[in-house]
UniProtKB/Swiss-Prot annotation:
Cell compartment(s), UniProt: Endoplasmic reticulum membrane
Descriptive protein name: Acyl-CoA wax alcohol acyltransferase 2
Record note on quaternary structure: Monomer.
Catalytic reaction equation(s): a long chain fatty alcohol + a fatty acyl-CoA = a wax ester + CoA; all-trans-retinol + an acyl-CoA = an all-trans-retinyl ester + CoA; an acyl-CoA + a 1,2-diacyl-sn-glycerol = a triacyl-sn-glycerol + CoA; 9-cis-retinol + a fatty acyl-CoA = 9-cis-retinyl ester + CoA
Role, per record: Acyltransferase that catalyzes the formation of ester bonds between fatty alcohols and fatty acyl-CoAs to form wax monoesters. Shows a preference for medium chain acyl-CoAs from C12 to C16 in length and fatty alcohols shorter than C20, as the acyl donor and acceptor, respectively. Also possesses fatty acyl-CoA retinol acyltransferase (ARAT) activity that preferentially esterifies 11-cis-retinol, a chromophore precursor of bleached opsin pigments in cone cells. Shows higher catalytic efficiency toward 11-cis-retinol versus 9-cis-retinol, 13- cis-retinol and all-trans-retinol substrates.
Protein family per UniProt: Belongs to the diacylglycerol acyltransferase family.
Gene symbol of the encoding locus: Awat2
GO biological process: monoacylglycerol biosynthetic process; wax biosynthetic process
Pfam families according to UniProt: DAGAT
Length: 333
């Protein structure tokens, strides 16, 4: 009889941790829809659905008002298995003071932003010890907060909406020692996520600079070396039918549909799990910005350029440690 070893059980837990987070949105949304349709159509318990929708309306602004984090959820043992799967590692280049607020900008987005979630929406890679006195707020799409239970699960990790009003609230109403974490490349950057890629969708992303200037907070560049190696992606012929559809779809719904794949339940199989590749996120030093409540386009462009320069410097200083050649550069599109 075959008995699984401790290593087998550990691997199984790591795979489960990846699956439960990656599929949580799909499972929760589907369950909520089916259960509520059943309650309304086939039973007399429709008031349950009414109560749920009433609570949703009452609680609607919470993701833009600091969320509702639970430290116990951020410290779940399950997240340790999540980070060990790759594994994930974070490197700090400079201490930061809890007497100020910060916007940490994480690059690249990759296909799933696995490393950013592991470091800043959980505490299993040692964020609280690495940055004592700092409270991270992982900012994500507002759509994650539209569905009951899913919104509560996402908020429990300390995540909030990435809307402008949410950022303004966190930077003015929560005191100091707050770190807003944004992945500015977003879903638009997915199209460039192939193994070895160092291309970032950043030229048109200036809103985070404007917000930082408005509140006079420092920007912190961070680069996750290895994030784009977690999946393969099929690149369709430029100008072909599928490529035109991808661009049309992105224009319509702001999501670029990608044909990506990774490993399956076993290491040598094909599937949608990310490859077990180490990802190291290097957090740079803060770039101080002056407080300008209504910065002009020229001022925003100036500090956007300074931020890109700081990001390039961080990338060039550390790239050879992670298998990137000395001649390979960061490409900004």
């Amino acid at each position: 009889m075959f008995w699984p070893t401790k290593k087998d059980l550990k691997t199984a837990m790591e795979v489960f941790a990846l699956f439960q987070w990656a599929l949580s949105a799909l499972v929760i949304v589907t369950t909520v829809i089916i259960v509520n349709l059943y309650l309304v159509v086939f039973t007399s318990y429709w008031p349950v659905t009414v109560l749920m929708l009433t609570w949703l309306a009452f609680d609607w602004k919470t993701p833009e008002r600091g969320g509702r984090r639970f430290t116990c959820v951020r410290k779940w043992r399950l997240w340790k298995h999540y980070s060990d799967y790759f594994p994930l590692k974070m490197v700090k280049t400079k201490d930061i003071s809890p007497d100020r607020n910060y916007i940490l900008v994480c690059h690249p987005h990759g296909l799933m932003a696995h490393s950013c979630f592991g470091h800043f929406a959980t505490d299993t890679t040692g964020f609280s010890k690495t940055f004592p006195g700092i409270t991270p707020y992982m900012l994500t799409l507002g759509a994650f907060f539209w569905v009951p239970f899913l919104r509560d699960y996402v908020m429990s990790t300390g995540s909030c909406s990435v809307s402008r009003s949410s950022m303004d609230f966190l930077l003015t109403q929560k005191g100091t020692g707050n770190m807003l974490v944004v992945v500015v490349g977003g879903l638009a950057e997915c199209r460039y996520s192939t193994p070895g890629s160092t291309t970032l969708f950043l030229k048109k992303r200036q809103g985070f600079v404007r917000t930082a200037l408005k509140h006079g907070v420092s920007l912190i560049p961070a680069y996750a070396f290895g994030e784009t190696d977690l999946y393969d992606q099929h690149i369709f012929t430029p100008g072909g039918f599928v490529n035109r559809f991808q661009k049309w779809f992105q224009k319509m719904v702001h999501i670029y549909p990608c044909a990506f794949y990774g490993r399956g339940l076993t290491k040598n199989s094909w599937g949608l799990l990310p490859y077990s590749q180490p990802v190291t996120t290097v957090v740079g030093e803060p770039l101080p910005l002056p407080k300008i409540e209504n910065p002009s386009e020229e001022i925003v462009a100036k500090y956007h350029t300074l931020y890109i320069d700081a990001l390039r410097k961080l990338f060039d200083q550390h790239k050879t440690k992670f298998g990137i050649s000395e001649t390979q550069e960061l490409v900004i599109v």
